[in-house]
């Protein structure tokens, strides 16, 4: 099962006491801030959680799986996530508190 933005907003509504509208807006603003920071080429560091980075992938050779034709895969930027030590430990230990 995946956690959705709507579910995060619902948790904020239930646990923090924000209105449903404010909770939804807060979640949207949070993710928009991450998007804008990455778009500007900066790293996002969430203490105790992990880091989002942009990585440049160079052009490389590829192949069309249907035709077998060689095609170049163009250079591009990709978003990477590196979990922090606290997150890694909690996931590895199965700790839910």
Curated annotation (Swiss-Prot):
Q: What's a Pfam family in this record?
A: Bac_DNA_binding
According to the UniProt entry, its GO molecular function terms are: DNA binding; structural constituent of chromatin
Does the UniProt entry include the keyword Transcription regulation?
yes
* Family matches, as PROSITE patterns: HISTONE_LIKE
The family classification in the record reads: Belongs to the bacterial histone-like protein family.
What's this chain's function? This protein is one of the two subunits of integration host factor, a specific DNA-binding protein that functions in genetic recombination as well as in transcriptional and translational control.
Q: Which HAMAP family match?
A: IHF_alpha (MF_00380)
Its recorded name reads: Integration host factor subunit alpha
Q: Which organism is it from?
A: Colwellia psychrerythraea (strain 34H / ATCC BAA-681) (Vibrio psychroerythus)
